[in-house]
Amino acid sequence: MNRRRRIYEGKAKILYEGPEPGTLIQFFKDDATAFNKKKHDVIDGKGVLNNRISEYIFTHLNKIGIPTHFIRRLNMREQLIKEVEIIPLEIVVRNVAAGSLAKRLGIEEGTVLPRSIIEFYYKADALDDPMVSEEHITAFGWASPQELDDIMALAIRINDFLSGLFLGVGIQLVDFKVECGRLYEGDMMRIVLADEISPDSCRLWDIETKEKMDKDRFRRDMGGLVEAYQEVARRLGIINENEPPRGSGPVLVK
């Protein structure tokens, strides 16, 4: 991979040029970040698990007709993806009050919301990814009204699928974050799901115990992040029931 041109490096992934025009290679790092990189560790094995879990979810989404950038997994840390023009928004779908929503509105964490809520955040680390409205999005040209309709329709379908998928293995989907992009195919353009879906980008609670099985374990210094991600992968049937934990836990990066 060192011989390939690096296109972009984010908090948890690196994009390299792909083997064919219109493709990229997405590499999953072991970096764990929170609060827009104010907190940063490297946790051995996290990237491998996120790659496997995201592959599993994107493959199933493709099968049910939800368009994504995913082509196939190449190895333990890399995926082949379609090159898209990323829309500078984080789309958050919330089913249960947690995190910033609970704090912002004074709702007790764990309260089931009257209905699923979609929120938008402008992707700008320097501004701490501010929450924005549909009016902001269309006024500043980040997405057109039609694109916004497409994004919201995708988000609702993804939420329906993920909620059922996780419910079937005893996990409650509290909320999740996705990103979308414009995929150009000849003269045609369509909105597709991009980035990843993994315990890094979802809040996942055990239905019975309410044990957190996501990146909140890192945000809140609870420990056991890799073990929690492994348990998600085991329940989904992605890794063997008896596969031993990878790595030796978090390593602080100075």
UniProtKB/Swiss-Prot annotation:
GO biological process: 'de novo' IMP biosynthetic process; cobalamin biosynthetic process
Enzyme class, first EC level, given as a word: ligase
GO MF, one example: phosphoribosylaminoimidazolesuccinocarboxamide synthase activity
Annotated catalysed reactions: 5-amino-1-(5-phospho-D-ribosyl)imidazole-4-carboxylate + L-aspartate + ATP = (2S)-2-[5-amino-1-(5-phospho-beta-D-ribosyl)imidazole-4-carboxamido]succinate + ADP + phosphate + 2 H(+)
InterPro entries cross-referenced by the UniProt entry: SAICAR_synt/ADE2_N (IPR028923), SAICAR_synt_PurC (IPR033934), SAICAR_synth (IPR001636), SAICAR_synthetase (IPR050089), SAICAR_synthetase_CS (IPR018236)
This protein's UniProt keywords: ATP-binding, Ligase, Nucleotide-binding, Purine biosynthesis
PROSITE patterns referenced in this protein's UniProt entry, alphabetically: SAICAR_SYNTHETASE_1
A cellular component annotation (GO) from this entry: cytosol
Classification via Pfam families: SAICAR_synt
PANTHER family referenced in this protein's UniProt entry, alphabetically: MULTIFUNCTIONAL PROTEIN ADE2, SI:DKEY-6E2.2
Family: Belongs to the SAICAR synthetase family.
Identification of the protein by name: Phosphoribosylaminoimidazole-succinocarboxamide synthase
Organism this protein belongs to: Rhizobium meliloti (strain 1021)
Taxonomic lineage of the native organism: Bacteria, Pseudomonadati, Pseudomonadota, Alphaproteobacteria, Hyphomicrobiales
